[in-house]
Structures are given as structure tokens and as C-alpha cells.
């Protein structure tokens, strides 16, 4: 789970940063990390939420734990934006990285490894982390990609680039018969045949594989010439 350059920077073996931790530190300390901001924007413009579907280790854990695919509720899916906004507001109000103290990803990738390494003790902050992790894991078991759909602020941040990213999910309407095979395959519970540019799409490609008519494909966005 704790991959050196892919997730929580509190992980004992991390060598880079968590964009949400980065955003909080930007607010708390006022130092602008231009390089990392540029990297996040560049990645967002390249693939949008593609990271969530292909590289995120916590997303992989979601897939391993859950076998249920429920239709996403549009209003509920915006909760991750509320969490993103609340995270930034809390960093400003308390001058601290408050979300990191609750983040279930940090629980799994930092708190538990540090206790096993003997660096940290089982104390109140550790138990709080275990509580948020337990709730999140329970949600993952009940709902496919529960964390990615409703809670992940990183997913909310990358989804802002989804419709503008170079990597796009394309629907050939002349081939589509509205059979909803793509919707049955989608772990995010969206309807790719009608919502192929949705902000919740993690571009995992399961809908492409599930469409036996070849109506869904990935393509690179073409730059418009004036």
C-alpha cells in the first residue's frame, strides 16, 4: 500500500508529496511549491482522474474489498468537493493540517507502519486514525469505490480537470444500443453511455472492455485549429 512516490507523504518510505497535504501546508505556511503545483496541473490536464483508476493504491484496496456496484447518487457524489473545501478551510482556521489527522489513507500508510516500526505509540491520535479507517473500510465493503466516489479530496481535485484532460472517453453514438453493459461494468456507478465525460469517471477502462459493440473508446483530445 505504501508506494514510495504514489501516496501519503507521512508514509515511512515516501519520497514525494500528497497534493492534499501540499495544499494544506501552502495555506498554513504560505510557501508556494511551484514545481509540485505545476506537476499536479500537468498531470490533471494529461489524464484527469486517470490516476485514480490506474495508480492509486487506496483505490486498489477499494476494488479488492468491494464487489457491489450501486448507481451513484448525483448529489451525494459532490460530497468530496465539500470535504476538499472543508479541508482547505480547516487548514486556514486552525493553521494546521487537520485533514491529515483524520485521513484513512494516512492511517493505513503511516500510522500503522510507524507503530509496527516502534517509532509511534498507540495513543489517542492513533485510535482516531483507526476509527476513520474502520469507517472507510466498512464503506468500501458495502459500496464499490466508496472512498473514491464520496470522500476523496484528491479525487475531487483531479476531477476538476476531467473534462479538459487530453485523455478522453469517447462514445460512438451510432454503435451504442443503450444496453447499459458499460454501466454494469463501471465501479463508480455512473452511466458511461450517457455520462462518458462525468467528473466521477476514473478512466479505468472497464466500460470499454464491457462494451461488446465497441461504442466506447479512449482517445486523445485534438487541439482545435483556428
Segments (PLM) and residue ranges:
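Non-ligating segments of multi-cofactor redox enzymes
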Residues: 1-193, 199-226
